[in-house]
Amino acid sequence: MTLGKNKRISKGGKRGKKKTQETMSRKEWYDVVAPKNFEVRQFGKTICNKTQGTKIAADYLRGRVYESNLADLNKTQGDDDAYRKVKFVVQEVQGRNLLTQFHSMEMTSDRVYFLLRKWCTTIEAAVETKTADGYTLRLFVIAFTKKQSNQLSKNCYAKTRLVKWVRHRITNLIRQRLSKVNINEAVTLLTRNILRDRLAKRCNPIVPLRDLRIRKVKVVRTPRFDAQALLNAHGEIPASAEGEARVVEEAQEAPAAEATA
């Protein structure tokens, strides 16, 4: 029987093996910088491919969203802020620094479940307001009623008219307060609990409240990008040479161990 050629078997070329390039040698490290109203400015690092031809690294970095814990950003406020997560969006790249702006803030789910109780009324309000510099924020507020000092009943349910009154007052106070400030001042009011304490103080005379929290804040709409406003929000940017000084070494094959007799 005549044996034909096996077309699946191809002769190996005389070319040498292709040299593999270390993946990390094509990348650069950047510092993620928070606005100046936070105590810890450089809260993280990120990595991106270097600029090659028409692929500019800054175009891939703009629009990225990074999350951090509020207790890590404000060290002096203690661990009470550990249950809140803050997100920032990159708006501009300046050297190896990523200039970010506030994107959203949210309580952790376990903290929300911890606040829930039986035999009380849960009051929720969703408020949409616009800051003085054109940012549209949507806030979600949650409050819980409590017993009065001379109450004998084990439940502390609030009447519907009182719930509506509390919700109406929360809406008016938030819109009046945040419509007069810019985005950085609004974030300070939210992260420092200034607005929350003000709401609790004004709503307690209507119905006794055990707790009132701003559960979630998110930026719904943003104005046209203004580079000067972003630079004013950041002020002096702390320098960090760690990203520039980082050296990525090429991977080398380890020498084969000699066989022992």
Curated annotation (Swiss-Prot):
This is Small ribosomal subunit protein eS1A. Belongs to the eukaryotic ribosomal protein eS1 family. The keyword Protease does not apply. It comes from Trypanosoma cruzi (strain CL Brener). GO terms for cellular component: cytosolic small ribosomal subunit. Residues 1-18 have a biased composition (Basic residues). InterPro entries: Ribosomal_eS1, Ribosomal_eS1_euk. GO terms for molecular function: structural constituent of ribosome. Residues 1-23 are annotated as: Disordered. Keywords: Cytoplasm, Ribonucleoprotein, Ribosomal protein. Component of the small ribosomal subunit. Mature ribosomes consist of a small (40S) and a large (60S) subunit. The 40S subunit contains about 33 different proteins and 1 molecule of RNA (18S). The 60S subunit contains about 49 different proteins and 3 molecules of RNA (25S, 5.8S and 5S). It is found in: Cytoplasm.
